[in-house]
Protein backbone atom coordinates (compact mmCIF):
# COMPACT_ATOMS: atom_id res chain seq x y z
CA UNK A 1 0.00 0.00 0.00
CA UNK A 2 0.87 3.67 -0.22
CA UNK A 3 0.17 6.13 2.61
CA UNK A 4 -1.96 9.20 1.88
CA UNK A 5 -3.19 11.77 4.37
CA UNK A 6 -6.13 14.14 4.16
CA UNK A 7 -5.52 17.78 5.02
CA UNK A 8 -8.01 20.60 5.53
CA UNK A 9 -7.93 24.32 6.08
CA UNK A 10 -9.71 25.03 9.38
CA UNK A 11 -11.10 28.08 11.12
CA UNK A 12 -12.45 28.26 14.65
CA UNK A 13 -13.44 31.94 14.34
CA UNK A 14 -17.02 31.98 15.73
CA UNK A 15 -18.10 34.85 13.44
CA UNK A 16 -17.09 32.89 10.34
CA UNK A 17 -18.41 29.54 11.58
CA UNK A 18 -21.81 31.08 12.47
CA UNK A 19 -22.30 32.11 8.83
CA UNK A 20 -22.11 28.54 7.56
CA UNK A 21 -24.32 25.67 8.71
CA UNK A 22 -23.88 22.56 6.58
CA UNK A 23 -21.77 21.14 3.79
CA UNK A 24 -21.18 22.61 0.33
CA UNK A 25 -19.46 20.55 -2.39
CA UNK A 26 -17.55 21.81 -5.40
CA UNK A 27 -16.78 20.02 -8.64
CA UNK A 28 -13.84 17.62 -9.01
CA UNK A 29 -10.88 18.75 -11.08
CA UNK A 30 -10.09 16.81 -14.26
CA UNK A 31 -8.04 13.73 -13.32
CA UNK A 32 -8.73 14.13 -9.62
CA UNK A 33 -9.90 11.08 -7.66
CA UNK A 34 -13.54 11.09 -6.50
CA UNK A 35 -12.63 11.48 -2.81
CA UNK A 36 -10.84 14.76 -3.55
CA UNK A 37 -13.88 16.94 -4.27
CA UNK A 38 -13.35 20.17 -2.34
CA UNK A 39 -16.03 21.05 0.18
CA UNK A 40 -16.77 23.46 3.00
CA UNK A 41 -18.05 21.66 6.08
CA UNK A 42 -19.19 22.63 9.58
CA UNK A 43 -17.92 20.29 12.30
CA UNK A 44 -18.58 20.28 16.05
CA UNK A 45 -16.09 18.45 18.26
CA UNK A 46 -16.43 18.55 22.05
CA UNK A 47 -18.89 21.42 21.70
CA UNK A 48 -16.45 23.52 19.63
CA UNK A 49 -17.75 24.47 16.17
CA UNK A 50 -15.23 24.73 13.34
CA UNK A 51 -15.36 25.15 9.62
CA UNK A 52 -13.22 22.88 7.44
CA UNK A 53 -12.29 23.29 3.78
CA UNK A 54 -10.66 20.57 1.73
CA UNK A 55 -9.58 17.86 1.40
CA UNK A 56 -6.06 18.32 0.15
CA UNK A 57 -3.76 15.36 -0.29
CA UNK A 58 -0.87 15.13 2.11
CA UNK A 59 1.93 12.62 2.38
CA UNK A 60 4.06 10.97 5.00
CA UNK A 61 5.69 7.52 4.93
CA UNK A 62 3.69 6.62 8.05
CA UNK A 63 0.80 4.16 7.72
CA UNK A 64 -0.88 5.63 10.82
CA UNK A 65 -0.97 9.26 12.01
CA UNK A 66 1.28 8.27 14.90
CA UNK A 67 3.11 5.48 13.05
CA UNK A 68 6.77 5.05 12.22
CA UNK A 69 8.63 7.16 9.66
CA UNK A 70 9.85 3.80 8.28
CA UNK A 71 6.41 2.17 7.68
CA UNK A 72 6.38 2.57 3.89
CA UNK A 73 10.03 1.65 3.42
CA UNK A 74 9.74 -1.40 5.70
CA UNK A 75 6.77 -2.64 3.63
CA UNK A 76 8.67 -2.71 0.31
CA UNK A 77 9.77 -6.21 -0.67
CA UNK A 78 11.04 -7.72 -3.92
CA UNK A 79 7.67 -9.45 -4.45
CA UNK A 80 5.65 -6.20 -4.21
CA UNK A 81 8.06 -3.69 -5.75
CA UNK A 82 6.88 -4.41 -9.31
CA UNK A 83 3.24 -4.01 -8.27
CA UNK A 84 3.96 -0.67 -6.61
CA UNK A 85 5.86 0.64 -9.64
CA UNK A 86 3.27 -0.75 -12.06
CA UNK A 87 0.38 0.82 -10.16
CA UNK A 88 2.13 4.19 -10.27
CA UNK A 89 2.93 3.96 -13.98
CA UNK A 90 -0.61 2.84 -14.82
CA UNK A 91 -2.06 5.80 -12.90
CA UNK A 92 0.19 8.68 -13.91
CA UNK A 93 -2.75 11.12 -13.83
CA UNK A 94 -3.33 10.24 -10.17
CA UNK A 95 0.39 10.47 -9.41
CA UNK A 96 0.50 13.90 -11.07
CA UNK A 97 -2.57 15.01 -9.10
CA UNK A 98 -0.91 13.95 -5.81
CA UNK A 99 2.36 15.70 -6.68
CA UNK A 100 0.58 18.96 -7.55
CA UNK A 101 -1.45 18.73 -4.31
CA UNK A 102 1.70 18.20 -2.28
CA UNK A 103 3.41 21.18 -3.93
CA UNK A 104 0.40 23.51 -3.57
CA UNK A 105 1.24 26.68 -1.69
CA UNK A 106 -0.81 28.16 1.12
CA UNK A 107 -1.79 30.93 -1.30
CA UNK A 108 -3.08 28.44 -3.89
CA UNK A 109 -5.17 26.63 -1.26
CA UNK A 110 -6.54 29.96 -0.08
CA UNK A 111 -7.54 30.86 -3.65
CA UNK A 112 -9.52 27.61 -3.85
CA UNK A 113 -11.21 28.44 -0.54
CA UNK A 114 -12.17 31.87 -1.89
CA UNK A 115 -14.18 30.19 -4.66
CA UNK A 116 -16.48 28.97 -1.85
CA UNK A 117 -16.07 31.90 0.56
CA UNK A 118 -14.92 35.02 -1.35
CA UNK A 119 -14.32 37.04 1.83
CA UNK A 120 -12.15 34.37 3.50
CA UNK A 121 -8.85 35.74 4.81
CA UNK A 122 -5.72 33.61 5.23
CA UNK A 123 -5.17 34.86 8.78
CA UNK A 124 -8.35 33.06 9.93
CA UNK A 125 -7.44 29.62 8.55
CA UNK A 126 -4.78 27.03 9.42
CA UNK A 127 -3.88 23.64 7.96
CA UNK A 128 -4.69 20.41 9.82
CA UNK A 129 -4.09 16.75 9.03
CA UNK A 130 -7.47 15.10 9.43
CA UNK A 131 -6.60 11.49 8.74
CA UNK A 132 -4.23 8.94 7.33
CA UNK A 133 -4.93 5.90 5.16
CA UNK A 134 -3.11 3.36 3.06
CA UNK A 135 -4.06 3.22 -0.62
CA UNK A 136 -4.32 -0.39 -1.76
CA UNK A 137 -2.06 -1.47 -4.64
CA UNK A 138 -2.20 -5.09 -5.73
CA UNK A 139 -2.31 -7.44 -8.69
CA UNK A 140 -5.71 -7.59 -10.34
CA UNK A 141 -7.40 -10.72 -11.71
CA UNK A 142 -5.37 -10.31 -14.92
CA UNK A 143 -2.10 -10.24 -12.92
CA UNK A 144 -1.47 -6.56 -13.67
CA UNK A 145 -0.99 -3.89 -11.00
CA UNK A 146 -4.08 -1.93 -9.93
CA UNK A 147 -4.89 0.76 -7.40
CA UNK A 148 -8.02 -0.25 -5.54
CA UNK A 149 -10.36 2.40 -4.23
CA UNK A 150 -12.59 1.57 -1.30
CA UNK A 151 -11.62 -0.67 1.59
CA UNK A 152 -10.32 -4.18 2.04
CA UNK A 153 -9.49 -6.35 5.03
CA UNK A 154 -5.92 -7.63 4.70
CA UNK A 155 -4.54 -10.35 6.98
CA UNK A 156 -1.28 -12.17 7.51
CA UNK A 157 -1.00 -15.70 6.11
CA UNK A 158 -0.97 -17.16 9.63
CA UNK A 159 -4.02 -15.11 10.68
CA UNK A 160 -2.32 -13.42 13.63
CA UNK A 161 -2.71 -9.89 12.28
CA UNK A 162 -5.32 -8.11 10.17
CA UNK A 163 -6.05 -4.55 9.13
CA UNK A 164 -8.55 -2.48 7.20
CA UNK A 165 -6.89 -0.65 4.30
CA UNK A 166 -8.28 2.06 2.08
CA UNK A 167 -10.75 4.90 2.50
PLM-predicted stretches and their roles:
Residues 1-69:
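Flavin-dependent oxidoreductases
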Residues 59-107:
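Alpha-helical membrane-targeting segments
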Residues 3-7, 12-14, 86-161:
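Flavin (FAD/FMN) cofactor-binding core of flavoprotein oxidoreductases
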Residues 31, 46, 74-75, 135-139:
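Charge-rich, low-complexity amphipathic helices
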Residues 32-37, 76-80, 153:
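Glycine-rich loops and low-complexity Gly/Arg-rich segments
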Residues 161-167:
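Glycine-rich phosphate/pyrophosphate-binding beta-alpha loops
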Residues 27-31, 70-75, 144-147:
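Short, low-complexity, polar/charged sequence segments that are solvent-exposed and flexible
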Residues 73-78, 112-114, 119, 167:
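Internal hydrophobic alpha-helix adjacent to the cofactor/substrate pocket in enzyme cavities
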Amino acid sequence: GFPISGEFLRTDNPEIVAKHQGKVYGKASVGAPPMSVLHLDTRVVDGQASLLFGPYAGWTPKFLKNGSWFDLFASIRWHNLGTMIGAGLKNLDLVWYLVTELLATRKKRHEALQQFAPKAEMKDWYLITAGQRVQIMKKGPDGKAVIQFGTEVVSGADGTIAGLLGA
